[in-house]
Amino acid sequence: MKKYCKLFMLMLLVFSYSYAGIMPETEWAKRKLKGKVKSMVKTEYGYENSGKIKFTSLVKTEFNENGYVARESFTRDEVEYKIVQYQFDKNGFIAKRIEEVPQKSLNNYKYSYKYSKDGNLVEKSELLERAKGYYPMYDIITYNKLGKEINELKYVEGKLEGDVSTFYNERGDAIEVKNNRNPDYPYILIYYDYHKNGGYEKTVDGHGRRSFVLIDKNGFQKELAYILFFGSKNPVVQLDTYVKNVNEKRDKYGNITEFTSISYDVLENNKANAEDIYKQLKEQKIKKIGISGKVEITYEYYD
């Protein structure tokens, strides 16, 4: 009997160690950052068609040595409007998240973790208190063995308000985001055209909108197009946004430090479907509107 008991305990120990290394994907990986970034300050300038500055936004992000965000602050036109701070436990998991909107609200979230029967990491974030009243609210996120989010449940006052699953291809890129509360309706579908040089084109369908994104081999977004659909039968198709990001600069680690966004429109914006509009974009049958934005990013590194 003791022999079987020891064997059972050994199996439990092996099972435990098999999944103990699973962690959520780091922000360094999500943002495709190179090197051990300690902090980054991203300043964005938005322009009107006349060339006049429309807004200035600044996001300062501080990372811990494991690549997770420790603190992030958001400023627009010199007014800080949101601060998010994270506290971590001894195993490196998030233990607490504090969201502060200066002069308005302070939200505290507590985190807990466990492993599912199939060995996936399950994270629960629960709202503990709110400056303007309290109501029970929590999210449950499940991560696969690679640390990528595969399911998110949202509960408000004990009632399930959201159930969304994400599916990936063999490269680890998301290909579908599914609303499990309405499984017959495709929530978001994502298609890829991978290039031999390491870049790719991504098409995203969902929410009455199709987007086309061109990414280069370094992970930099070169082009972005949003096409809107109005109406369910014979929908009206309209190009909402087409932007090219140019003049990118990088630091010695290979991280982007600067780029300029230029807006365009197609010459014939009255086509019957999204493919015709996108064909015009690919054939460069477009007209330049002007500079719509400029981004500057500075970094501090651990090493």
Question: Language-model segments: what does each one mean?
Answer:
Residues K3-L10:
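Sec-dependent signal peptide recognition
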Residues A20-D303:
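Buried hydrophobic residues that stabilize the cores of well-folded domains
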Residues M11-Y19:
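Hydrophobic h-region of N-terminal signal peptides that target proteins for export
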